[in-house]
Regions:
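A glycine-/small-polar-enriched, mobile loop at the entrance of the PLP active site in fold-type I
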Residues: 12-69, 73
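Conserved PLP-binding catalytic core of the aspartate aminotransferase-like
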Residues: 294-327
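Active-site C-terminal subdomain of aminotransferase-like
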Residues: 22-23, 198-286, 290, 392
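Conserved beta-loop-alpha segment that forms the PLP phosphate-binding cup at the N-terminus of a helix
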Residues: 63-91, 95, 99-103
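Active-site phosphate-binding strand-loop segment of PLP-dependent enzymes
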Residues: 123-179, 192, 200
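PLP-dependent enzyme catalytic core of the Aspartate aminotransferase-like
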Residues: 338, 342-392
Length: 392
């Protein structure tokens, strides 16, 4: 009788969606190291390296850096659960899906959520944001630096300056910026920032890097009510990672992977890494526009990690994505919410942000569009090659 459960063999995939992204062989190799216990001295040695490297990746001198056991949404919930308080005003700047998720979490904490909303993919006017924060006088301000639903990069500094003028602290979602674009926690004045592992860091999902400023830690100590989440209580987590007191069973394997991915970030250097992402993003956009497609987000507001070209008229985005998966083993994503069927979300981030992958995705996307009857206006690969050559 044949074995109904033979050894697992996952299909090969080229991950060019909004995450997870491609993982470097070096990171995979780290995950094959011996598993140790979550209170083993070696585990804490690795965890200490991870905490230091998280500070480097976020461009911060904050001593409080953690990797939360959970995905980026766990990082979001940790930030909100510790700093949103019942009855206190929580100001949300929203121009995409994930900002509204922050708001939902804050409401569940009992905070009074007030919202400045923009159309998905449209930037905030700095003066309007400043006036909104001044008028509301909130306890906390939250925004998404890199909005994964739209490919939008929101400028942090004006928001943080306005929040601090009002006496508020700032939470920033850096899920799709960390490791691929400048986050600059200290320079921008971000008080609490969180991210994930499976995008710009090029690591499998499962941990959420988080950093907290000394000013925010003082606020946390003065909470009127206990943090409602035991698992995500930052004070308890700190006793685990710095005091080596049991809290939960952290995954040694995921910490090995994150340690290696962050070490690769440090070896490359943040500025060089950002420039690599910027160069490949610009080449990809040059190719997309040469093919006759438009980008959802205006030039200066685009993410370098996640590209959002609009779906041409008459093209079924789901069929394009299925073609890429079935014929090329390539995963990209579509839009959702008000952008469902209107955009592609194509990630070139972390280990996957290379000139070769720019060409690969442009060629494959062109073939998928032709299969739908779309005739490109020009040669996307040639335009991308020209952009890459000009950037050298």
């Amino acid at each position: 009788m044949p074995n109904p459960y033979p050894p697992l063999q996952a299909p090969p995939r080229l991950l060019f969606g909004p995450g997870p992204s491609l993982v470097a062989p070096r990171v995979y190799a780290a995950m094959t190291q011996n598993v140790v216990g979550h209170l083993d001295p070696f585990f804490f040695e690795v965890a200490d390296q991870v905490r230091s490297l998280i500070g480097y990746a976020f461009s911060t001198a904050n001593p409080f850096n953690l990797a939360i056991s959970g995905t980026g949404s766990a990082g979001m919930e940790a930030a909100v659960a510790n700093f949103a308080e019942p009855g206190r005003k929580f100001a949300l700047l929203s121009n995409g899906f994930f900002a509204d998720r922050i708001g939902e979490m804050a409401r569940r904490q009992g905070a009074e959520v007030v919202r400045l909303a923009k159309e998905w993919g449209k930037p905030f006017d700095p003066q309007e944001a400043r006036e909104f924060i001044r008028r509301q006088q909130p306890h906390m301000v939250a925004f998404v630096q890199a909005e994964t639903s739209t490919g939008m990069y929101n400028q942090a500094k004006p928001i943080c300056e306005a929040a601090h003028e009002a006496g508020a602290l700032v939470i920033a979602d850096c899920v799709t910026s960390l490791g691929g674009m400048p986050v600059l926690v200290d320079e921008n004045g971000i008080d609490i920032a969180y991210s994930c592992t499976q995008k710009g860091l090029g690591c499998p999902p499962g941990l959420a890097p988080l950093t907290v400023s000394p000013r925010a830690l003082e606020r946390l100590k003065g909470r009127a009510a206990p943090v409602q989440s035991w698992y995500l209580d930052l004070a308890l987590l700190d006793t685990y990672y710095t005091g080596h007191k049991y809290h939960h069973t952290a995954s040694a394997t995921l910490f090995y992977a994150l340690r290696e991915a962050l070490a690769m970030v440090a070896e490359e250097g943040l500025e060089r890494r950002w420039e690599r992402h910027r160069r490949n993003h610009l080449a990809f956009v040059a190719g997309i526009e040469a093919m006759g497609l438009e980008m959802l987000v205006a030039g200066g507001d685009r993410l370098w990690t996640l590209n959002t070209p609009c779906v041409p008229a008459g093209v079924d985005d789901a069929k394009v994505r299925q073609y890429l998966l079935d014929r090329r083993g390539i995963e990209i994503a579509g839009g959702f919410g008000p952008l469902a069927g209107k955009i592609f979300r194509i990630g070139l981030m972390g280990y996957g942000s290379t000139g070769e992958n720019v060409m690969l995705v442009l060629e494959a996307l062109g073939a998928a569009l032709r299969d739908q009857g779309y005739q490109a206006a020009g040669d996307g690969r040639a335009a991308a090659e020209k952009a890459l050559a000009a950037a050298v």
